[in-house]
Amino acid sequence: MNTQQLAKLRSIVPEMRRVRHIHFVGIGGAGMGGIAEVLANEGYQISGSDLAPNAVTQQLTALGATIYFNHRPENVLDASVVVVSSAISADNPEIVAAHEARIPVIRRAEMLAELMRFRHGIAVAGTHGKTTTTAMVSSIYAEAGLDPTFVNGGLVKAAGTHARLGNSRYLIAEADESDASFLHLQPMVAIVTNIEADHMDTYHGDFENLKQTFINFLHNLPFYGRAVMCVDDPVIRELLPRVGRQITTYGFSEDADVRVENYRQTGAQGHFTLVRQDKPELHVTLNAPGRHNALNAAAAVSVATEEGIEDDAILRALESFQGTGRRFDFLGEFPLANVNGKSGTAMLVDDYGHHPTEVDATVRAARAGWPEKNLVMIFQPHRYTRTRDLYDDFANVLSQVDVLLMLDVYPAGEAPIPGADSRSLCRTIRARGKVDPILVSDPAQVAAMLAPVLSGNDLILVQGAGNIGKIARQLAEAKLQPEENAHG
């Protein structure tokens, strides 16, 4: 750490001068890697461990971090503090070794809270839309010359990274409710996009517990802070009287403080008007498809307006918005001549959405922007518990596509649950009579099973949160060609 970096670091958090070496267990995760990247750029010595290399670990290695692709006690012994992902179990050898050596072990959100402590924190929470909204706020602040620090759960395409250290007092961060760790954060502004039943194991299956946790999160705001909340969401509308802070509401609803009107979509762009209290209307062109993204933009504009950012900067940022990785991520348009001998093309889009609400939003955006396309979805359910708990909702939304290929459930460490598997879900969807799903038991066969169902005017949605993103990239690299055709 050089003198200049250390001086800057001490000016932000003087007490953290005692910390030299920060070790991350599960460093390859987007949220963990983002915080590690900011701290590396602040001059800390960073190390971490994960099971396999990925784009996040490559980026950190380039910044000088030491990455171990194993979990061993000796990896942590020189650390001042160990940061642990919620995906890591308490019996991990590095965690055990840290406890034995009396090295503090903290969760990711606790370290994020330290980054936020002496900055103007803007935290983005909610069941859906966090990553994109965080990126939109960051883009607007950057366009306005405010040079924010941001820590996002997905790749911010314009920056080519999940996180970036800025030189201003602003820190914009995604706030994760999945393990309730967002309660560590004490932001100045908090966005809540929506609240639905997800990650219910954290909340002991009690939706009231989840709702109260969001209230507690908002009450971490100082009394002069501000909550920015989507009034279209019925749960948020119900909770508004319980929020003892200043509130700005947004949405399509007539009574929203920042109201979306006249929405229309052409291809990948949304066009709409934002009506604000005591401010001129904004006529927005948003470079992201779907009504859900208009809501995300309304949240970002609400925050930017409150900060006093000029309208021109807001409009420029939204029109040039490059999106985030795996959120309606356009991977290319490929001719089918070498795929199945047909004329025409197929567009390939990769999307992380894995909850029925998210999948529905993606399908609606695809239908609105490309109504003439044959909509083909390759879906990988994520977790047996989610598939069980939202089974009917999944069956309904997946019945909306023209062609459905379904991979086996990505377990994310869970044991199989009878009746909550992909074969059962396919059977249920088939019985509804709208679409005849194709079960793909071997991921290596996706391209071969996809080729015959493509018509020559297709939009392929690769959908899910497991390892299906890797399959999307492989399809793009092979230009959709099955392996036996790929070299022909």
From Swiss-Prot:
Keywords: ATP-binding, Cell cycle, Cell division, Cell shape, Cell wall biogenesis/degradation, Cytoplasm, Ligase, Nucleotide-binding, Peptidoglycan synthesis. Transmembrane segments: none annotated. InterPro entries: Mur-like_cat_sf, Mur_ligase_C, Mur_ligase_C_dom_sf, Mur_ligase_cen, Mur_ligase_N, MurCDEF_pg_biosynth, UDP-N-AcMur_Ala_ligase_MurC. It is an enzyme of class 6 (ligase). It catalyses: UDP-N-acetyl-alpha-D-muramate + L-alanine + ATP = UDP-N-acetyl-alpha-D-muramoyl-L-alanine + ADP + phosphate + H(+). GO terms for molecular function: ATP binding; UDP-N-acetylmuramate-L-alanine ligase activity. Coiled coil: none annotated. GO terms for cellular component: cytoplasm. ATP binds at residues 126-132. It is found in: Cytoplasm. GO terms for biological process: cell division; cell wall organization; peptidoglycan biosynthetic process; regulation of cell shape. Its EC number is 6.3.2.8. Pathway: Cell wall biogenesis; peptidoglycan biosynthesis. PANTHER family: UDP-N-ACETYLMURAMATE--L-ALANINE LIGASE, UDP-N-ACETYLMURAMATE--L-ALANINE LIGASE-RELATED. Belongs to the MurCDEF family. Cell wall formation. This is UDP-N-acetylmuramate--L-alanine ligase. It comes from Cronobacter sakazakii (strain ATCC BAA-894) (Enterobacter sakazakii).
